[in-house]
Amino acid sequence: MHSLATAAPVPAALAQVDREKIYQWINELSSPDTRENALLELSKKRESVPDLAPMLWHSFGTIAALLQEIVNIYPSINPPTLTAHQSNRVCNALALLQCVASHPETRSAFLAAHIPLFLYPFLHTVSKTRPFEYLRLTSLGVIGALVKTDEQEVINFLLTTEIIPLCLRIMESGSELSKTVATFILQKILLDDTGLAYICQTYERFSHVAMILGKMVLQLSKEPSARLLKHVVRCYLRLSDNPRAREALRQCLPDQLKDTTFAQVLKDDTTTKRWLAQLVKNLQEGQVTDPRGIPLPPQ
């Protein structure tokens, strides 16, 4: 373990005086009296300090302090009494953990320490109040930052946890923003070959995913969101790469994806339109047509 002063080379863009402030705030995380302000300042600066993640990870007591912030609000989850102030404070701690999760030098250690599991109680919450919604969204952001790296070790880790059912529940009943991030996480898991195989391994897993995606399509036909629809279509398209899932989707793909329901929403989105066309094509291929022009399922 090295001292903060030698944690990393100084980026040219960051003035020395700012570096000193960063070191000071990191040291202040260790003390409960100075932690709240340090969390706020560091979370504001995290985008402009490229090596903040290694500094947080390797400095004495810092990760323990961030985990303490998380554990401290567990009692406010059930019964749900979380205040806006509590939510803002813990979300600043989560923002710093997201920084650690997405940095190539600290990601593996972050996973090896099973730190994402500390966030799962927040994803289990169902209260619709703003403090809880913000808490769920920020927690999803940490997992989203992990999957965005497209690293095999991330998917392997997540598949050993309950992240898929947690995401599916949020996809069904969260706010539009939370649904979007949760669907993005599922999409990233599906795009990995191991993730696709895992979800299609049993009928129960596949049917749970297909059921939630189907409900989302129905909801989107009433309250359209191009961004959310894009992720839903990509999930369906990826599922159609698996032969067994493709067979099942021929029966259960929502009609709204086969007719003109979303034509207006997607009129300027060439990527999603292409994915949708490919999905329909994938489901048609391999079907035998009888003389009356009716597609027959393969024998």
Curated annotation (Swiss-Prot):
- Subcellular location, in the record's words? Nucleus; Cytoplasm, P-body
Q: What terms describe the molecular function in GO for this protein?
A: transcription coactivator activity
Q: Which keywords does this Swiss-Prot/TrEMBL entry list?
A: Activator, Cytoplasm, Nucleus, Repressor, RNA-mediated gene silencing, Transcription, Transcription regulation, Translation regulation
Q: Name one GO cellular component term.
A: CCR4-NOT complex
Q: Per the UniProt entry, what is one GO biological process?
A: negative regulation of translation
Q: What's the domain of life for this entry? A: Eukaryota
Binding partners and assembly: Homodimer. Component of the CCR4-NOT complex.
As for family, the record states:
Belongs to the CNOT9 family.
State what this protein does. Component of the CCR4-NOT complex which is one of the major cellular mRNA deadenylases and is linked to various cellular processes including bulk mRNA degradation, miRNA-mediated repression, translational repression during translational initiation and general transcription regulation. Additional complex functions may be a consequence of its influence on mRNA expression. Involved in down-regulation of MYB- and JUN-dependent transcription. Enhances ligand-dependent transcriptional activity of nuclear hormone receptors. May play a role in cell differentiation.
Q: What is this protein called?
A: CCR4-NOT transcription complex subunit 9
